[in-house]
């Protein structure tokens, strides 16, 4: 991250800190609840939320910003089941790759690949804008995960 400007370094740190919060939240959830969903349609398990964030991060940081395709099955992210050690290992690998992507990103340049249907998004004009979108998504999904954790881990009544 040495070639990044101070404000770009701040963005990189915010992104990694937010992902670390997701990681730690999943780590705190008891193993037996890690693949549980809330009793409502469209609910996702903690593992599904974490895996979705991993796929989302690399899609934008590598496939879009750098033009280096990272295979992703978005639908599978929302039906995934995995034990906690496996999910956290995958998340750790994703974090390392994501940080490497950021360090290679020329923040003020246009992304290498514009996803179909997203070309008109105002934040797609620079790689930094794309990473701000990733930050927005991580914040949203951290909130989703925290609500899921709070309901799954609440004391029985």
Give names to the regions the model predicted.
Residues 79-115, 128-139:
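Acidic/histidine-rich alpha-helical segments that form the ligand environment
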């Amino acid at each position: 991250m040495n070639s990044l400007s101070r404000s770009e370094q701040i963005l990189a740190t915010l992104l990694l800190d937010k992902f670390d919060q997701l990681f730690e939240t999943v780590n705190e959830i008891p193993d037996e609840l890690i693949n549980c969903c809330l009793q409502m349609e469209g609910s996702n398990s903690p593992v599904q939320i974490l895996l979705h964030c991993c796929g989302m991060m690399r899609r934008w940081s590598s496939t879009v910003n750098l033009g280096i395709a990272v295979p992703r099955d978005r639908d599978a992210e929302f039906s995934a089941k995995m034990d906690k050690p496996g999910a956290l290992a995958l998340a750790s690998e994703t974090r390392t790759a994501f940080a490497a992507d950021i360090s290679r990103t020329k923040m003020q340049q246009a992304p290498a690949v514009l996803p179909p249907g997203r070309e008109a998004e105002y934040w797609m004009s620079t790689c930094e804008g794309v990473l701000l979108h990733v930050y927005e998504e991580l914040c949203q999904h951290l909130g989703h995960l925290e609500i899921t954790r709070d309901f799954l881990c609440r004391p029985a009544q």
